[in-house]
């Protein structure tokens, strides 16, 4: 009996262990059931947008249902398409990296895809061209505002003329590489960007240069015509040398440490033509002077220089022009601009190498861009980097190299353990920032200019902010993380706007893992404000304006943090004319975290109209249960003038961005504008003595529906001074035709200037922003008032 009991007990124990094992396997399957988007595309988390596009295209051609007979091909392709749609978008990628797929639940992405032929022939047409930079929404502004000269091709993947242009654009890019930046924008992927630039047909080619409006190219789309169009915008000076200016021109350049590249044109042999000379002057601008001499008219001078036939020669500073046997003088046999350019660059002196003894002094008094090397480093010795001194001269930035083997302790103190580039701001060795982007000429130029003029520094254990220090914004990041790299330029912009108020620093978590663990950093980038003992994590988009909004919100909170008690007193017992919006959330909930910056932004937009609060359902779980909150985030609106007071409306919209939430909330505000009929329009607007602003709309018009809440805000903003009315042009078509309304919505001002009858057409207002419209019409009414007062004085 005892044996049987033990056997039964043993069997029961085995069964329990088996069940537990199966439960654990099931839980593991649930945890890992979501496919990793990076794995689906076969890319690393450090992949660039170009690499993501290339990987997706390769998979699309292989797995597309048009070519793949797998019964499940459609669903499989939807998965990789979803992965691509998320990872190509900077904001969605950041959310995915931080919260996983749950952070994307509100996003309607990846529901469809294009045909196989689209991916084969139309998708990413410039991704394999190194000379052409494909610019996305997040890269465009930085590129055209960098100070560099850009020629950009705005195209659409389905446009046949765009595909016809592609081979020519590639040839043009190769020929002009180094003279200007060649870009391409896919308007199929970046519709809003192209619309903001006024692009409504394809292809559209524009020159962008700092200090001038974009210039559109209208000519024939041939390489020669494109080159001829671009050349005048390239800064280049070619000097014709002759007996009257030869000596002074040479001596002035040599005294400044600049050499001369001179092509001598004689009756025999070949010299460089005009366009080649101009290209070389552009390529070598600031490094070498470019000139030419006509030996047919300057025969004596050419004889003195022992020039007997056409030749192209580089004379370094200090060289003797008549001593051409000198090894420093370089004779060039090529007639190709790029070949000559490379030879001359190789002949120029290398960047200055800084000694350990002089480093501290140099960094204390001057701005520097330094290449940190470990012995011989081919990358820092690239001839093209000699141009950095020219590009950074206007910012008073010097360029040099420091070999960490010459003083390992210095590099160790800076936490530099591998070759890198750093910008020092002229305030000592601790005020620096390390470059984490591509080590290419124009990327380094942009980084150096941004960094030395901003107030972001690299942090480590010795200078990490403590509790008793100033307010700091610290960006915890990893260099391999693309959203992290995209955030850095935005931090620099924000640091300039908040200089003297908040200090900015970055901490590399791949180097300072202990510090990052101490602050519970689990995703990159994580941006935190340390305000003495208070810590606030930023959860917005990677742009300076939203960072500034976040800081302003910390100073002047737009959202009330509610407790069960304050919910009762402020929301439940609100005044009859008061409205509240409340977000019921849990701190661990990914969609809740993604909502928070949008929630705060919405609160600022409706400040003074609707009160906004939030309540932590993890902290007050019993209260949320009593309020029947069953999921997070739960957004509720408690309206005005409704009994009982616990009545609310629940937001069920798909999009949780600030604009969508704002528009939804404003629908519940009591209407401040008047609906006008033809009769009331004539009686009150045309023949009345009030100032009116009118919105002419059609009910079926999407932009009209979006503008409606904005117009209601306007009506409240000008209440008491200007009356606001709406005219339904579907119901009153004749009235709108008589007022020459050609599109919807149309905003018109009808000011009263003392005459018996107003103009039927009013004054057009070309804006859909309530604040801007209010400013425009207020100024106009004040101007009319001043004219009337002046007229009355004259009458007296």
From Swiss-Prot:
A motif (Prevents secretion from ER) lies at residues 793-796. Residues 36-100 form the J domain. It is an enzyme of class 1 (oxidoreductase). Disulfide bonds join 159-162, 481-484, 589-592, 701-704. Residues 349-464 are annotated as: Trxb 2. Its main location: endoplasmic reticulum. The keyword Repeat applies. Residues 1-33 form the signal peptide. It comes from the Eukaryota. GO terms for biological process: ERAD pathway; IRE1-mediated unfolded protein response; protein folding in endoplasmic reticulum. Residues 236-351 are annotated as: Trxb 1. One of its GO terms (molecular function) is protein-disulfide reductase activity. It is found in: Endoplasmic reticulum lumen. Pfam families: DnaJ (PF00226), Thioredoxin (PF00085). Endoplasmic reticulum disulfide reductase involved both in the correct folding of proteins and degradation of misfolded proteins. Required for efficient folding of proteins in the endoplasmic reticulum by catalyzing the removal of non-native disulfide bonds formed during the folding of proteins. Also involved in endoplasmic reticulum-associated degradation (ERAD) by reducing incorrect disulfide bonds in misfolded glycoproteins. PANTHER family: DNAJ HOMOLOG SUBFAMILY C MEMBER 10 (PTHR44340:SF1). Thioredoxin domains 3 and 4 are the primary reductase domains. This is DnaJ homolog subfamily C member 10.
């Amino acid at each position: 009996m005892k044996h049987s009991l033990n056997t039964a007990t043993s069997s029961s124990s085995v069964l329990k262990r088996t069940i537990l094992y199966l439960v654990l396997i099931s839980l593991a399957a649930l945890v890992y059931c979501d496919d990793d988007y990076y794995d689906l595309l076969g890319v690393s988390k450090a992949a660039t947008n170009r690499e993501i596009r290339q990987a997706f295209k390769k998979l699309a051609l292989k797995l597309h249902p048009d070519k793949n007979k797998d019964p499940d091909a459609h669903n499989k392709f939807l998965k990789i398409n979803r992965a691509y749609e998320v990872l190509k978008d900077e904001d969605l990628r950041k959310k995915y990296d931080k919260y996983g797929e749950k952070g994307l639940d509100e996003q309607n992405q990846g529901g469809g895809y294009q045909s196989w032929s689209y991916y084969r022939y139309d998708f990413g047409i410039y991704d394999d061209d190194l000379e052409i930079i494909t610019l996305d929404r997040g890269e465009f502004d930085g590129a055209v505002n960098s100070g560099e000269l850009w020629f950009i091709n705005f195209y659409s993947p389905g446009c046949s003329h765009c595909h016809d242009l592609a081979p020519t654009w590639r040839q043009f890019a190769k020929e002009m590489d180094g003279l200007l930046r060649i870009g391409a924008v896919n308007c199929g992927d970046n519709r809003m960007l192209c619309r903001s630039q006024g692009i409504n047909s394809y292809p559209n080619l524009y020159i962008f240069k700092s200090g001038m409006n974009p210039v559109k190219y209208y000519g024939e789309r041939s390489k020669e015509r494109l080159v001829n169009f671009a050349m005048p915008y390239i800064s280049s000076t070619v000097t014709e040398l002759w007996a009257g200016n030869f000596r002074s021109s040479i001596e002035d350049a040599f005294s400044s440490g600049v050499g001369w590249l001179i092509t001598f044109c004689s009756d025999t042999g070949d010299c460089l033509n005009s366009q080649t000379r101009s290209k070389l002057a552009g390529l070598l601008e600031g490094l070498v002077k470019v000139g030419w001499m006509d030996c047919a008219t300057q025969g004596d001078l050419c004889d003195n220089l022992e020039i007997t036939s056409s030749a192209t020669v580089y004379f370094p500073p200090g060289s003797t022009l008549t001593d051409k046997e000198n090894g420093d003088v370089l004779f060039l046999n090529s007639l190709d601009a790029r070949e000559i350019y490379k030879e001359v660059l190789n002949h120029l002196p290398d960047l200055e190498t800084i000694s350990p003894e002089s480093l501290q002094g140099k960094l204390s008094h001057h701005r520097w861009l330094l290449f940190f090397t470990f012995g011989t480093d081919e990358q820092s010795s690239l001839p093209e980097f000699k141009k950095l001194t020219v590009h950074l001269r206007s910012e008073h930035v010097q360029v040099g190299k420091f070999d960490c083997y010459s003083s390992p302790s210095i590099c160790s103190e800076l936490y530099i353990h591998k070759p890198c580039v750093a910008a020092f701001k002229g305030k000592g060795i601790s005020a620096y920032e390390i470059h984490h982007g591509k080590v290419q000429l124009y990327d380094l130029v942009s980084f150096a200019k941004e960094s030395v003029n901003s107030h972001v520094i690299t942090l480590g254990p010795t200078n990490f902010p403590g509790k008793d220090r100033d307010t700091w914004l610290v960006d915890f990041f990893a260099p391999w993380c693309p959203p992290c790299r995209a955030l850095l330029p935005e931090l620099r912009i924000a640091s300039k706007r908040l200089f003297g108020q908040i200090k900015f620093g970055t901490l590399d978590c791949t180097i300072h893992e202990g510090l990052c663990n101490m602050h519970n950093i689990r995703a990159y980038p994580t941006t935190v404000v340390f305000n003495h003992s208070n810590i606030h994590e930023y959860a917005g988009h990677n742009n300076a304006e939203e960072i500034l909004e976040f800081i302003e919100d910390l100073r002047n909170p737009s959202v009330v943090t509610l407790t069960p008690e304050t919910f009762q007193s402020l929301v439940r017992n609100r005044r009859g004319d008061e409205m509240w919006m409340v977000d019921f959330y849990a701190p661990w909930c990914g969609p809740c975290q993604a909502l928070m910056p949008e929630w705060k932004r919405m609160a600022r937009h409706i400040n003074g109209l609707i009160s906004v609060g939030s309540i932590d359902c993890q902290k007050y779980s019993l209260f949320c249960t009593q309020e029947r909150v069953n999921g997070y985030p739960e957004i509720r609106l408690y309206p005005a003038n409704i009994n009982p007071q616990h009545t609310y409306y629940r937001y069920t919209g798909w999009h949780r961005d600030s604009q969508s939430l704002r528009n939804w909330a404003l629908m519940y505000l009591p209407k401040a504008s008047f609906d006008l009929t033809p009769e009331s329009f004539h009686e009150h607007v045309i023949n009345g003595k009030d100032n009116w602003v009118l919105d002419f709309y059609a009910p079926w018009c999407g932009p009209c529906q979006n503008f409606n809440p904005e117009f209601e805000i306007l009506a409240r903003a000008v209440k008491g001074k200007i009356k606001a009315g709406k005219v339904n042009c579907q119901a009153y078509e004749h009235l709108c035709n008589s007022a020459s309304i050609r599109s919807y919505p149309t905003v018109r001002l009808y000011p009263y200037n003392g005459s018996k009858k107003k103009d039927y057409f009013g004054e057009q207002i070309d804006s859909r922003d309530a604040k801007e419209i209010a400013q425009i019409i207020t100024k106009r009414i004040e101007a009319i008032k001043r004219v009337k007062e002046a007229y009355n004085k004259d009458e007296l």
